């Protein structure tokens, strides 16, 4: 459900989502997406139904004052939206409950810095709360590719997958590490990309498996979608 809410929020136009899970984590994701420019309204008489009007562009942060992005205790919201917001413009402050401020996120932020995002950690190194100064992801800064370890979380990769269609050029992500944590969830992300008409290519090479996005105009609105979970 997180992925489809994000896709619909990034799309141009209006989408309808059905059977969206009802949870505090999803509430956090929706609230941040709306604060960044999307509009989400419950469908009358339908539990889990939402009409989503996209941002018509990129996530919009603050200019002088950062946009507050409170993830509470949702690690999924934190990891997916840190990448997505980095593809936007402006200042974003990502923070949450105390336990979230003990979870490192540096594997992802290193990749975002390589793509042009300024990251500043406010307290503990490599953990939220953190400040993003975003000007859109720029694959050309790093030769069109970044390397990402999969040992800690597959959601770093999913976040980049969701953010990549907003980039002005194809992005290749070279996957590394000794193991891939929760790889089936990457499959959910790829399925979401397919539903929204985003093309991609997966190649397997030793020792890692690069992935390349082929943006064809970015996110497009869906008339209707039913998230897998």
Task: Give the location of each predicted region.
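Structural preference for solvent-exposed beta-strand-turn elements
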Residues: 1-229
